[in-house]
Amino acid sequence: MSDSSRSLIPSFLYSSDHRLFQATTMSTHLKSQPLISPTNSSVSSNGTSFAIATPNEKVEMYSPAYFAACTVAGMLSCGITHTAITPLDVIKCNMQIDPLKYKNITSAFKTTIKEQGLKGFTRGWSPTLLGYSAQGAFKYGLYEYAKKYYSDIVGPEYAAKYKTLIYLAGSASAEIVADVALCPMEAVKVRVQTQPGFARGLSDGLPKIIKSEGFRGLHKGLVPLWGRQIPYTMMKFATFENTVELIYKKVMPTPKEECSKPVQLGVSFAGGYIAGIFCAIISHPADNLVSFLNNSKGATVADAVKRLGLWGMLTRGLPLRIFMIGTLTGAQWVIYDAVKVLAGLPTTGGASPATALAPSVSA
């Protein structure tokens, strides 16, 4: 690749000393050990070996392997965390849908135990796992791609000057696609969690919605979902990136590159939790709306406002959601960055001020 086809990208957008990825002669560098032997069936007929890189092998920044690693990390971070908090999600959704019956967290917990037993807290786990795994893959993978792509378009000077706009534009672009993947599973999840007897889970809930409402029934909540998730994700990524940068500049006594990996992952959790609090507040009215529309056949936005009230739309279930989303977002960034570290990549955010030479992302 010629110099003209490469672009200088401000390293604040990516949290590494780029020399870690460009140096080819390091006395401490371990030899690459492919997971798949070149003598086995992974070698194609033309002699090309398709080996998966081990953690000791170098992954070039912004290469296809880099974006693939970020996609897998995003899939794991969102799928695992959202499934783990299914019990809290059950309580939250029921409080949003039927505030007269589920008046607060305590009464919602007691009512669920009384009517459904402990099993009631696991309702909807399978569509949650599948839906948010798909969403996480697109969200994080496309965010990293879009962040690099928009930086290439504006150039290093404007990317440095308007870095927060890069974060916002990249995260919004990624979330638009990610929600299309999430929406069908979200529709099934809400029905299963808030309508006892509707279905046992994904296997019978999905066909039931398709039979009664057609495939449109799986996507009727897409626009409200965008209304909830796009502001949420923009806040999540922009706040996280800036918070982590601030922590390394103002709080940590040593530069990021001198901090141990556990310390860096701790910073990722702190930045994620702070970002999650802001995410919960800005996206909560739309979250109430999504739950109401997915639970009520033929319901409109006006019906939701009339039933819940404007104040209820803003506050119903908010304390629980702040705790849930704060913990969730912090854990997501830890898992995401841990997977990147295992792949030999840097954690996200808080880079040193040096610039890095990196391949351009083609349109």
Curated annotation (Swiss-Prot):
Question: Which superkingdom heads the taxonomic lineage of this protein's source?
Answer: Eukaryota
Residues on Mitochondrial intermembrane side: 144-164, 241-261, 343-363
**Membrane-spanning regions, if any?**
65-85, 124-143, 165-185, 221-240, 262-282, 322-342
What this protein is called in its record is: Mitochondrial phosphate carrier protein 2, mitochondrial
Q: Which UniProt keywords apply?
A: Membrane, Mitochondrion, Mitochondrion inner membrane, Repeat, Transit peptide, Transmembrane, Transmembrane helix, Transport
Family under the similarity heading? Belongs to the mitochondrial carrier (TC 2.A.29) family.
| Cellular location(s) | Mitochondrion inner membrane
GO process annotations (BP): mitochondrial phosphate ion transmembrane transport; response to salt stress
Keyword Ubl conjugation included in the entry's annotation: no
- Extra info from the record? Plants overexpressing MPT2/PHT3;2 display increased sensitivity to salt stress.
One Pfam family of this chain:
Mito_carr
Principal location class: mitochondrion
Question: What is the species listed in this Swiss-Prot or TrEMBL entry?
Answer: Arabidopsis thaliana (Mouse-ear cress)
Query: Could you name the Gene Ontology cellular component terms for this entry?
Result: mitochondrial inner membrane
Topology relative to the lipid bilayer, per the entry, is: Multi-pass membrane protein
An example Gene Ontology molecular-function term: mRNA binding
